[in-house]
Amino acid sequence: MYYPFVRKALFQLDPERAHEFTFQQLRRVTGTPLEALVRQKVPAKPVSCMGLTFKNPLGLAAGLDKDGECIDALGAMGFGSIEIGTVTPRPQPGNDKPRLFRLVDAEGLINRMGFNNLGVDNLVENVKKAHFDGILGINIGKNKDTPVENGKDDYLICMEKIYAYAGYIAINISSPNTPGLRTLQYGEALDDLLTAIKNKQNDLQTIHHKYVPIAVKIAPDLSEDELIQVADSLVRHNIDGVIATNTTLDRSLVQGMKNCDETGGLSGRPLQLKSTEIIRRLSQELKEQLPIIGVGGIDSVIAAREKMAAGATLVQIYSGFIFKGPQLIKEIVTHI
């Protein structure tokens, strides 16, 4: 299709500039008749997960549309779900640029964005304007200047503001680009956070008369013992789902490539096997007590099928979407 030509032009630009340019164009069409320019017909393949019905099993992973600016245009491409964010209570600029790097030969990306976003209030206003008929997930995190020991307060603030508008809420405790954030995945810190989140979910369910499921997004770099502990905590706290995985700090598959030594999280094809193995082990530990949303290096129908064979109920794409374009959505939904 036309995307290889578009990609060639975009890849002449700095990665973040290419992202900004693309979103400028998408903002122009989102919510207008011009959405027809990006619309794709995909078959209906409903899937039940977390008490919700997804019109197909393919979602857009968090990080692409951090502020929910282009929900309708992205939805027109055929996604069954879109996860916007990560959003924080207050706006923040993120880390210094450059902070996004391509590993073209490996079809991977390294980012150290640092939760750059315009804040939760801005995101909510964008969500109110959207008409996406799929499931909208909202991914939340903590502000960089919030001490880790107070981090749960940021998640609770975001939950309160987005609850009425979210199909599900994703708790991001696994980005490698916010200092100390990944420590919330372990032991007492995780139990304390999940207790607070479940209590808040119960309170908000009473206020809004609807139940919004909670999914926790985990890292691919967990040790075996850490993975077992995380799985146990998710089950004990009745969390509704788990998103596996975020980006990796491992560089073993990209040694010697341009940009391989940049600090940040690695995504795309080099993450594919590692994330699939985490899904497989999680599935064994969870024993179908809660569903897994599989993400990490999905760039083909085969890769999507591998995630589902490992135990994922739903799958998400991000880097594969950058490298392969909207056609990947149609291919996966049609043939998965």
Curated annotation (Swiss-Prot):
- The UniProt annotation places substrate binding at K66, N111, R112, M113, G114, F115, N172, N177, N246, T247
**Enzyme nomenclature, EC number:** 1.3.5.2
Location in the cell reads:
Cell membrane
Against Pfam families, the record matches this protein to:
DHO_dh
- Record's bilayer topology term: Peripheral membrane protein
- GO MF terms, alphabetically ordered: dihydroorotate dehydrogenase (quinone) activity
PROSITE patterns of this UniProt entry?
DHODEHASE_1 (PS00911), DHODEHASE_2 (PS00912)
- Keyword list, A-Z: Cell membrane, Flavoprotein, FMN, Membrane, Oxidoreductase, Pyrimidine biosynthesis
Query: Which residues bind FMN per the record?
Result: A62, G63, L64, D65, K66, T86, N139, N172, K217, T245, G268, G297, Y318, S319
Q: Which reaction does it catalyse?
A: (S)-dihydroorotate + a quinone = orotate + a quinol
Q: What does this protein do?
A: Catalyzes the conversion of dihydroorotate to orotate with quinone as electron acceptor.
What is the protein's quaternary organization? Monomer.
What is the designated name of this protein?
Answer: Dihydroorotate dehydrogenase (quinone)
